[in-house]
């Protein structure tokens, strides 16, 4: 499949560097879309699966202005210290993870929840039973209901 950055390399400095390059590209793309369509962050929901979740969390929380919300599936925070140092807002976040995920360990859901709580960011988390590294219908329903509440 497609990936934003290479997670096969286990050097944390390399991973963070590659991640930040991808983050800059995504931020630039979002800025272009916001300018073209005259839309503000508070009207945008950032969402992603796996690395897309990781990107959504970082881009969402390091933006000058908060987004409507972040919805992440089966991801993690790439570097807790980096995000803590660069966080600029308190965008509400929903994180969903499968308990049988063998690609991105479900322990990362707990690490992310701890980070959000320590940073006083509203976070809702769901650990889906008997779920590997994919998005089941249950997760989609949870996410849809969350987004519908946020965009009203």
Which role fits each region the language model picked out?
Residues 1, 77-82, 103, 135-136:
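A short beta-to-alpha transition loop/helix N-cap that caps and shapes the active-site region
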Residues 1-39:
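Serine-hydrolase catalytic machinery in alpha/beta-hydrolase-like enzymes
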Residues 42-89:
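Primarily recognizes the serine-hydrolase "nucleophile elbow" in alpha/beta-hydrolase
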Residues 75, 98, 130:
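Cofactor-binding loop segments of dinucleotide-utilizing enzymes, especially the Rossmann-like FAD-
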Residues 88-93, 119-122:
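Short, proline-enriched alpha-helix->beta-strand connector loops that line the catalytic pocket
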Residues 94-97, 101:
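Short beta-strand/loop motif that positions the catalytic acidic residue
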Residues 110-152:
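C-terminal catalytic histidine-bearing segment of alpha/beta-hydrolase fold enzymes
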């Amino acid at each position: 499949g497609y990936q934003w950055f290479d997670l096969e390399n286990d050097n944390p400095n390399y991973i963070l560097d590659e991640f930040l390059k991808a983050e800059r590209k995504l931020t630039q793309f979002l800025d272009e879309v916001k300018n073209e369509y005259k839309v503000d962050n508070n009207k945008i929901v950032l969402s992603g699966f796996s690395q897309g979740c990781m990107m959504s969390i970082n881009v969402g929380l390091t933006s000058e202005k908060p987004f409507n919300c972040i919805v992440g599936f089966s991801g993690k925070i790439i570097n807790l210290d980096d995000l803590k140092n660069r966080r600029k807002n308190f965008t509400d976040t929903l994180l969903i993870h499968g308990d049988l995920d063998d690609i991105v360990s479900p322990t990362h859901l707990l690490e992310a929840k701890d980070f959000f709580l320590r940073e006083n960011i509203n976070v809702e988390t769901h650990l889906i039973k008997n779920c590997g590294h994919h998005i089941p219908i249950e997760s989609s329903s949870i996410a849809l209901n969350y987004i519908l509440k946020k965009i009203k």
